[in-house]
Amino acid sequence: YGMYEVLANLNDIKTVNVPLKERFQIDVKSVLSAVNFNTKLIFICSPNNPSGNLLQINDIKTLMDEFNGLVIIDEAYIDFAPNSSFISELNDFPNLIITQTFSKALAHAGIRLGMCFASERIISVLNKIKPPYNVNQMTQKKALEVVQNFDTYLVQVEIVKSEREILVEEFNNINWIEHVFPSAS
């Protein structure tokens, strides 16, 4: 997701991009060889944006095991994926941070609200550096409405997943389209 690099540049933070392998998977060797003692974190999108595929679980776990810094997984599209979130791995990986959003599956991009899941230690640090009153009253109200109507959200996600499969079938019927990659977003 390109906005991470934009935000890093605005804050004068050096970034290193490591291209994905064929089939849009993490090149673990290349990532680990690109990091050094100054590298503080690795950002991963899974499902990936823009390719839409899930990254291989074992590759992500290898990065979390072998990298001596924070591994941040952007799960903005996880609700559309067949696999579940990495949230269940938080107790096993103290260097893991997971971000999610109200923008995609919850269909509330306009309220600009996200969630961060991490160890108590990491959350404690983040709470010390976040701006005061960082979520306005209108956003809080709308988010509460969404959470209180969660069943509606679950139905909407299933409809989107079903429509995605229909779209893939239709793309596969177009003779000039050479290949339709699977999508988890």
Where do the language-model regions lie?
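Short beta-strands and strand-loop turn motifs
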Residues: 15-19, 41-47, 71-74, 181-183
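Active-site pre-lysine segment of PLP-dependent enzymes
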Residues: 9, 25-37, 50-105
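PLP-dependent aminotransferase-like
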Residues: 1-44
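PLP-dependent aminotransferase class I/II
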Residues: 95-172, 179-180
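Active-site donor-binding loop signature of nucleotide-sugar glycosyltransferases
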Residues: 20-22, 46, 101, 120
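Short, intrinsically disordered, charge-balanced linker/junction segments flanking boundaries
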Residues: 15, 34, 173-185
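Conserved residues at the C-terminal ends of beta-strands
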Residues: 45, 79, 117
